[in-house]
Structures are given as C-alpha cells and as structure tokens.
Regions:
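Conserved catalytic cores of phosphodiester-cleaving nucleases, focusing on short active-site segments
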Residues: 30, 49-80, 92
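Catalytic cores of nucleic-acid endonucleases
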Residues: 2, 6, 71-126
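Short, low-complexity, polybasic intrinsically disordered segments
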Residues: 122-137
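A short beta-turn/loop motif at secondary-structure boundaries
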Residues: 41-45, 110-112
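Acidic-basic catalytic patches of nuclease active cores, encompassing PD-(D/E)XK
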Residues: 1-40
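Short acidic/glycine-enriched loop/turn segments that link adjacent beta-strands
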Residues: 44-48, 127
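Protein kinase-like catalytic core scaffold
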Residues: 47, 63-65, 116-119, 131
Length: 137
C-alpha cells in the first residue's frame, strides 16, 4: 500500500503512464488552488483512489476530497465522466469509507477528520483543459 506521490511502480503500461501524467497535472493544479494533496494512487483492498486531498474552501468549509481523474483525448466514444459508472463509483466509495473508518491513509499517514466528498476531474490534453465536477457522486 502506498500513498506517496512519487512512489509509482516502474512497470507501467503506456496508458497507465498517461493516467499518471494526468493525475500529476491535476495534483499540480489543485495545489496551485491552495489544496493539500495527501496522497496519490492510494490502494485500499483491491481498489485505488487516484487522489486524496483537502479542499480548504471557501465558500464551503474544508473538506476531504476523493478525486477520480479521467483522461480523454477524444470525445468520439463519449465523455470521460461517463466512464465513472455505478460500479466504479461504488468501488471508490467503498475504498474511501474503509480508509475513513480506519482514520488514516493506508501508509499510516494522518487523515484529517473532515466531511468527505467525491469529485471527478477530467483532463483533455494538448493543451491541457480541465473539467472539475465537484460532489459528482
């Protein structure tokens, strides 16, 4: 279990590397907006959470945010958001609630006790464009 930002396996497929790059772009953008990135690629059981972060607000008070990052280079097969279906959402929620119930990140790092929400952020490359869906599910 690893939640450290730079600790990704070396044997990644090209698609996985593109996903990693998209997650890095999103993490950078959120950090520039004042968010704290607590962990990337967090494994809880068999499921993975792309980003675990804190949105400091305003307008809302600080929240723990589980971010699902999606990369899509074309809309020919629909919107990237549409790939986060019921099953994927259930897996993300289950993993997040297990982590929250444990009160810590899987690597033992602290997890702030804040209200939680689930966001989807879509990255469209060349040049990078972002669509941020807050409280998406």
């Amino acid at each position: 279990m690893d939640g450290h930002p730079g600790a990704l396996p070396r044997n990644r497929t090209p698609a996985q590397r593109l996903g990693d790059d998209a997650e890095a772009l999103v993490a950078k953008r959120l950090t520039e907006q004042g968010w704290s990135i607590l962990a990337r690629n967090v494994h809880v059981g068999r499921h993975e959470l792309d980003l675990v972060a804190v949105d400091p607000g305003p307008p809302a008070p600080p929240q723990l945010v589980i971010v699902e990052v999606r990369l899509r280079s074309t809309r020919a097969f629909g919107l990237a958001e549409e790939t986060v279906d019921f099953r994927k959402r259930r897996h993300i929620r289950d993993a997040a609630w297990r982590m929250i119930a444990a009160g810590a990140l899987p690597d033992g790092g602290p997890l702030p006790q804040l209200p939680a929400r689930f966001d989807i952020i879509v990255v469209e490359p060349d040049p990078p464009r972002f669509r941020h869906h807050r409280a998406a599910f």
